[in-house]
């Protein structure tokens, strides 16, 4: 009888714990992307929303990205309006979340990924203001020697 009473009393506590633990575990599992951007840049904020909607947690620094880009080893010629760091890899510009997931899964020997400039149609540059316009662009794998190669093309 005492065992049954104990189980009846413990059941609500266990049920509550299971409903709160799952979302916390999911948040803990989301890869964290640390981002440096201009505080007034709207397309950067749209890229952050794109990452959040695709399984990433984000921490944003609105202090500009030039110093972060240099510190993380992204060549200036591959620069864009924001810089990120995830899993030891640098991200420069409007890199699609799909390619970031792929990068983390494949773990290539590289500095990270870059989408130079601000191509219309890339994540963060795809809002209503751009209509249906989609410019072709490449996601580049940035190598330690400063070189790069095409990681994924968007046409």
Where would I find each of the regions flagged by the language model?
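Thiol/selenol-based redox catalytic cores and closely related redox-interacting motifs
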Residues: 71-155
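Local sequence-structure signature of Cys/Sec-based thiol-disulfide redox active-site neighborhoods
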Residues: 31-46
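N-terminal secretory signal peptides and thylakoid transit peptides that target proteins
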Residues: 1-15
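Stable alpha-helical elements in mature extracytoplasmic
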Residues: 40, 47, 64, 96-100
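Typically the conserved alpha-helix immediately C-terminal to a functionally engaged Cys/Sec
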Residues: 47-50, 54
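Residue-level detector of anion-binding/catalytic polar loops
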Residues: 57
């Amino acid at each position: 009888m005492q065992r049954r009473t104990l189980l009846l009393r413990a059941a609500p506590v266990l049920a509550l714990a299971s409903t709160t633990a799952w979302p916390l575990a999911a948040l803990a599992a989301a890869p964290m992307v640390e981002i440096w951007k201009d505080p007034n840049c709207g397309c950067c904020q749209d890229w952050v929303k794109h990452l959040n909607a695709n399984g990433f947690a984000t921490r944003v620094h609105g202090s500009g990205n030039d110093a972060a880009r240099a510190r993380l080893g992204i060549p200036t010629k591959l620069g864009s309006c924001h810089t990120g760091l995830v899993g030891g890899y640098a991200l420069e510009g409007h890199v699609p979340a799909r390619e970031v997931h792929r990068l983390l899964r494949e773990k290539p020997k590289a500095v990270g990924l870059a989408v130079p400039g601000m191509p219309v149609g890339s994540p963060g540059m795809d809002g209503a203001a751009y209509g249906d316009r989609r410019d072709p662009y490449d996601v580049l794998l940035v190598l330690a020697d400063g070189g790069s190669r095409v990681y994924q093309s968007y046409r």
